Each structure stands twice: as structure tokens, then as C-alpha cells.
Amino acid sequence: MRAGGEGAVFWLEAGVYRMQQIEPLEGQTILGASGAVLNGSRLLTEFTEVDGHWVAEGQTQQGVRHETDESAEGAQRPGYPDAVYVNDQPLTPVDSLDQLRSGTYFFDYDADRIFLGDDPHGQTVEAAVSPFAIASGANGVTVSGLTVEKYATPTQEAAISGNGEGWVISNNEVRLNYGVGINIGGNGQILDNHVHDNGQMGLNAGGGGILIEGNEIASNGFWSGIDVLWEGGGGKFTETDGLMVRNNYSHDNNGYGLWTDIDNVNTTYEGNRIEYNSAGGINHEISYSASIHDNSFVGNGGNGLTWLWGSAIQVQNSQDVEIFNNFIDASSGGNGIGLIQQDRGEGAFGDYVTVNNSVHDNTLILTSEGGVGAVADYDEERMLAGGNSFDNNVYHVSEGGEDQFAFGDYYTFENFGAVVGQDLGSSLLIG
């Protein structure tokens, strides 16, 4: 983009632009017509049959490998971004030829060969090559109207990566990239994008004054082989100040729907729909002041997680969080609102402790096993005396459960109020 100079506007006509890597200058704008696609892969069209397998020769790409030790259970070659797709579906990598099966591929890096487990003839086969679509440290860049897909983005890196200040990334479809779909830095905005089916995670961001609004974030975190509880799922935000996450629809991700982790302060989650994410809904972890309000949650974390893990709203070793006016439907399983304290040390603004959190005026629909409350496996006394409070909430359960309400120990709803003084102005509706 150097030919246009700083502040230039570029227009991409409809069409597929393969293996392009754009490094914007200060203030540049990149716009796409409907049907403009940045595709980080090459088409594979020539195959030979070798010992009953189909082989593409001359594959010299080898993407940067990060965090190969952060593997999901049973995954092979996690952190290897050299993805292969058949008809827009990512195949599963295996690490030896004798494990090749239908739906898998084996990349023999020594021989520069990709082996496929299925006959590719008549199919569209693509191999991810380029590590990013649009990325630079310039400030004030705008990216809008593009489809960005199939980039060999390393773990924790993004296909669109605004590493400078004030990027605006809007109205794009970002899909099928190995690592992360979109990343921004301070005073950046991610607006009205459809971010889906990326291998590790949909979004990430860090810095001050960030706005995440109006995005659909769906079905991310399923195929990179990286453990999503280490980092993956819908979106993760780190070391932010004044982060606003508003009116997004985050659903069906493998991991948390939305996640603030490490030294986030003055965070707001407002008006989001968070549905059917495997690990839980919103997780605010080892961070500080936040407001989580007027969000709706359905079906998050209902995958057999114990303790208060998998809550629709989960606060881990964080303080000064107000949780109010949320609607939580956990009738298919999972926990409601969980405050969790463990031994996590200290961060930029003090100890990572679960204190001074207020949970009020929320409506929850629970199973008889779904939990609510505060638990600790470290310095429980500090958490219990730390000003955490539950009040004026409404709980709906199909039948009366025993010991669903936690404040250190577990209690019935009646004893949650009578013994520990929580939820005194709340109600439990059975049936």
C-alpha cells in the first residue's frame, strides 16, 4: 500500500485475491465491493495416487508454530497453521501417514508433500499459505467490506491485525483462518463483522478505549487443536482499560463466548446475546472493575463442568464487578453466576482476589443441579469477608434443588439467606 501514500483509500473489486499480504500506512482505508475476497490459501489441483493415498507435491510452505504444547485433548499437531480445506471445510491434521483417514491430511514437511485421506477429484482443495491478510503498526486504518479467509495465521495472531492505534474494522466476514480472525489495539473498533469458524478464536484485543459492537461471533475454536481453555473460543481481551463490548451475538463457540483475561479494568459488557458456548458465557478473569449488565444468556457451559465452572457469568479472581439486569437461561444445564477465587497472585492494580462484587436484579432459569454463588480453594476467608453480595435476583427452577447456592459451603436457597445473609431480597420460583 506504499504507492498510495498515507491517508490513501483503496477499493477492491469483486473477485478472489489469493495469498495477498497488505501492510497499510497511516490513515489508509481499504474497502471491498461485495464479493471481494482475500484468500490466504493456494488451490491444489494436481494430485498423484501413492499407495492408495492422494498426494499434492511441491508444498514448501511451513507456517510459524506457536504454543504447540497447549494442545486440546487428543489433538495432533496443535499450533501448526498449515491448514488444508476441502469444499470450505478444514481437514484434521495427523502426524504420521499411518494415521491418515477420511477427513484428515498428513503434511510430510521433509518431502514437501500433502497426503489426503479422501479422493480430491471433483472437489475444491486449498492449502493455507500466507500468515496474514492485513496487518501493520500504522495508526488510523479502516478495513471494511471484505471477506478474509483461509490464512495460515499462527496461534494468537490474526488475519486482520491492527497493531497500531485507532483501527476501525467493520462489516467484514472473517472465517476459516487458523489462529484468530481479528485483532485490534488501543482506541480501535470492531464493528458489525461476521467472525466465524476460525480455528483458535474469533477476536482478540488489548489497549485503552476499545469498542467491540454489533458483531456476530460464531463457531470459533473447533479445529486448530489448541486448548480453548488456555485461549480460544469467541473472543479474548487482555490488558484493556475502558473496554466496551456491546450488542454482540456470540454463539456456538468452543470455549467462552467472551473473555476478559489479565489486567482488564473499567470493562463494560452490555446488551450482548451469549448462547451455546461450550465453556461458559462471559468470563472476567484476573482483572478488575467491570459492569456486566443487560445481557442475555442461553445454554452456555452445560457440558458437565463441576464446581461453579461453566457459569453463564463467571468472575475469576476479579474485584469490583457489578452484575445486574441479565437474563440467564441455564435450563439445559450449566451454572448461573459464579464468583471463583484461587491462588493467582497479583497484577497491575493489586491482588487478584474475588472481592467487592455485586450480583443483583438478575433473572435466572436453572436446573436443580445448576449452581450460583461464590467458591474458593484458596484464602476462602478473604473472599467470604470481602464484600461480595447477591440480592434482588429471581431464580426459576423446575423442582426444588438441594444446596444449589454457594458461599464457601453450599446451601439451600432458604439457608443462603438465613445463614450467610445472601439473596435476602431475592425470590425462588419452583415449577
Regions found by a protein language model. Name each.
Residues 1-431:
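Extracellular parallel beta-helix/beta-solenoid repeat domains
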